[in-house]
């Protein structure tokens, strides 16, 4: 029997050979649609979603409490977990639930909540994971561990046996398989146009009564059928949009519940948001867990949808050294204690005519309140580019990894724009550390040689390590100074891919007369040990240059074929296009087919004459509790630099003169066989590499072998060296 419903406008009857959604002939259409929305999930998924899985898993909490057992329940695409308050009872939802238990759980321990009376109180859920927007993988180093990655946290889980882990992974995979089918089915279905017919008998009868001929009636019928078909297509598109919006709403609601259960959202978009460190003693069921996952083999993900800016999954020592929670970085330098007096370069040159230039001490007026060691760390301001590169490589996209590495190599020059003061020259043996958990990195540098001046650094991030040393060779050309960095920077990812490059030449113009400015020029070769390498050309600025600071280059594969073209400005942004097709119009209009790789952050609102970036302002800050655990060689403890930052210029000049006299005596230490404390020279090469042990010594506050380099220099100190 056919179902007929009168169209309210045109007297059109909808006909379907099987009815709409297979409802009975007597049911109206509206009733059938309402019933289809309430169909059980198993009717859409073949019963896969109706299965509930439960069991006990061990969840990593923190280094104080370690692994703790939790009761996990997988139901309808949601994985929830709760603390086991009473070991003798593990609550299930209701007596009607068909629950598959994983693991060795005795029946006496299980209890079910009476859905009618609610006499037994259900355990409180402390965490929720929506599997549709999550991914998971097994551990390569432990056959009982696996990980679940979400936008807000990473769960580190462990089972009692290999069999139990396989069962949980199979259950998670089966649950994820239902989502594509579910999103296509939606809440109710439309009848395909080919199965839908329209009865126009009443319309034709009415037109004949009006005296219209047969040809005109057929033409009206065709117009009506065409309009109805178009309307049906539009309604179908609206239905699909509605379904997608409902799916997105479900995901947002689940994520909101997850954040509410965890107590605080600890995920920052693009690495720039607020971040809360995990305490080493507090419970971590509602906080971000950390563990060394990167040390394992190349992971095989069950879901490739991941987020670039996961909180750092560093080594165990990375968490152990983080003794502060909710570190709030400063946004401006301290207000100066006294008014600064300008210094005439001409008068300074006149006063020092005929003197030994090696003994001439420049006033602190020409310095900025950071050291060259801290300046090295400033190059890692945009370290999120390396996090992206790590994620791209992990997902198999080597080209995007190489592009982000190139963007990182360029981004380090952005902070030099408008910076006219020189950083403090470190003393021999001076060090600097930077533990920035909100960026997922920790950095360490040391001055390893005084003649020539060599600075070595080492940085650890999420899935990558960065190290290098640099020696500056300078040439004076009368009106300008040319600085050529000598040294190789190395970036190594946990999967073994390595990139190496050297910095380009920098020139400071108009040091005597005119407006002082800095420019970078030359060719940078970024060499990779696998599929891709990169060549970047920093264009030298000319007098009539209308578009200065340009950078152009390309990424090529091992066969020499250009895979992507890069262009932009080292002080603003960098773009890329696939292949070798680029022209000048794209350079002037980045909004064309190019994709943005990196963009410089906006300068701080409180600009001083130093023109420090927001990131550089934080480098010399002594956050609460930090001074007590720093070694006596750290740059933050250097007195002349601290006085300059506080605006105590007279004290800064006196301390600078004292320390530079001590610095000249440091050559005796180097000539007597002095060696760096934390770095060593690699073989016969001139490169230095981090030997390790600094962060461990920091954890124990063991600085017995670190000299007081900012104190008075004595002959006994030289003899002891």
UniProtKB/Swiss-Prot annotation:
Biased composition (Polar residues): 20-37
Database matches in SUPFAM superfamilies: Oxysterol-binding protein-like, PH domain-like
GO MF assignments: lipid binding
Domain PH intervals: 50-177
Coiled coil: 640-669
Chain segments carrying region Disordered: 20-47, 274-335
Keyword Lipid biosynthesis among UniProt keywords: no
Family the entry assigns: Belongs to the OSBP family.
Annotated function: May be involved in the transport of sterols.
Name of the protein described by the UniProt record: Oxysterol-binding protein-related protein 2A
Native species: Arabidopsis thaliana (Mouse-ear cress)
């Amino acid at each position: 029997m056919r179902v007929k419903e009168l169209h309210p406008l045109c007297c059109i009857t909808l006909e379907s050979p099987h009815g709409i959604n297979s409802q009975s002939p007597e049911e109206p259409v509206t009733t059938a649609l309402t019933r289809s929305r309430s169909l059980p999930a198993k009717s859409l998924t073949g019963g896969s979603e109706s299965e509930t899985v439960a069991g006990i898993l061990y969840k990593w909490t923190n280094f104080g409490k370690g692994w703790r057992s939790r009761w996990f329940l997988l139901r309808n695409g949601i994985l929830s977990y709760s603390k086991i308050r009473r070991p003798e009872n593990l609550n299930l939802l209701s007596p009607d639930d068909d629950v598959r238990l994983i693991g060795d759980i005795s029946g006496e321990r299980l209890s079910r909540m009476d859905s009618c009376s609610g006499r037994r109180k259900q355990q409180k859920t402390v965490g929720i994971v929506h599997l549709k927007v999550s991914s998971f993988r097994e551990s390569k180093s432990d056959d009982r561990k696996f990980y679940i990655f979400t936008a807000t946290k990473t769960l580190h889980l462990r089972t009692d046996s290999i069999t139990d882990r396989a069962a949980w992974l199979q259950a998670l995979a089966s649950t994820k398989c239902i989502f594509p089918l579910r999103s296509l089915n939606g809440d109710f279905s439309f009848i395909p146009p080919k199965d839908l017919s329209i009865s126009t008998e009443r319309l034709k009868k009415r037109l004949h009564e009006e005296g219209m001929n047969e040809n005109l009636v057929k033409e009206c019928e065709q117009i009506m059928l065409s309009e109805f078909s178009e309307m049906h297509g539009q309604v179908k598109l609206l239905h699909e949009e509605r379904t997608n919006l409902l799916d997105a709403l479900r995901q947002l609601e689940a994520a909101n519940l997850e954040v509410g259960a965890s107590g605080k959202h600890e995920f920052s978009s693009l690495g720039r948001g607020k971040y809360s460190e995990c305490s080493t003693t507090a419970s971590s069921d509602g906080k971000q867990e950390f563990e060394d996952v990167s040390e394992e083999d190349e992971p095989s993900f069950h879901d490739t949808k991941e987020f670039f800016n996961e909180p750092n999954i560093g080594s165990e020592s990375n968490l152990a050294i983080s003794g502060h929670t909710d570190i709030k970085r400063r946004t401006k330098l301290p207000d100066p204690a006294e008014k600064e007096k300008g210094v005439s370069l001409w008068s300074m040159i006149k006063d020092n005519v005929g003197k030994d230039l090696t003994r001439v001490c420049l006033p602190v007026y020409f310095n900025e309140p950071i050291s060259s060691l801290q300046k090295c760390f400033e190059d890692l301001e945009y370290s999120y580019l390396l996090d992206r590169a790590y994620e791209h490589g992990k997902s198999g996209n080597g080209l995007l990894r190489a592009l982000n590495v190139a963007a990182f190599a360029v981004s380090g020059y952005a902070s030099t724009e408008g910076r006219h003061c020189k950083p403090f020259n470190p003393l021999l043996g001076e060090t600097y550390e930077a533990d920035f958990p909100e960026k997922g990195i920790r950095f360490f540098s040391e001055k390893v040689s005084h003649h020539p001046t060599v600075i070595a650094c080492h940085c650890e991030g999420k899935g990558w390590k960065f190290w290098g040393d640099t020696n500056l060779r300078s040439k004076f050309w009368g009106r300008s100074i040319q600085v050529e960095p000598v040294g190789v920077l190395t970036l190594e990812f946990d999967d073994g891919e390595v990139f190496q490059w050297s910095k380009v030449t920098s020139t400071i113009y108009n040091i005597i007369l005119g407006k002082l400015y800095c420019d970078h020029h030359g060719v940078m070769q970024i060499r990779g040990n696998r599929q891709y390498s990169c060549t970047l050309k920093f264009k030298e600025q000319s007098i009539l240059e209308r578009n200065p600071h340009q950078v152009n280059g390309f990424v090529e594969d091992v066969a020499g074929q250009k895979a992507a073209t890069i262009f932009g400005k080292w002080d603003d942004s960098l773009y890329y296009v696939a292949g070798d097709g680029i022209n000048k119009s794209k350079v002037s209009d980045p909004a064309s087919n190019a994709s943005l790789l990196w963009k410089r952050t906006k300068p701080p609102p409180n600009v001083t004459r130093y023109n420090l970036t927001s990131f550089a302002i934080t480098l010399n800050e002594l956050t609460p509790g930090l001074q007590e655990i720093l070694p006596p060689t750290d740059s933050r403890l250097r007195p002349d630099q601290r006085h300059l930052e506080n605006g105590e210029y007279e004290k800064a000049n006196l301390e600078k003169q004292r320390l530079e006299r001590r610095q000249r005596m440091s050559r005796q230490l180097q000539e007597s066989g002095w060696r760096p404390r934390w770095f060593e020279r690699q073989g016969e090469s001139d490169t230095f590499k981090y030997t390790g042990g600094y962060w461990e010594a920091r954890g124990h506050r063991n600085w017995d072998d670190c000299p007081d380099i900012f104190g008075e220099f004595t002959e006994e100190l030289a003899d002891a060296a």
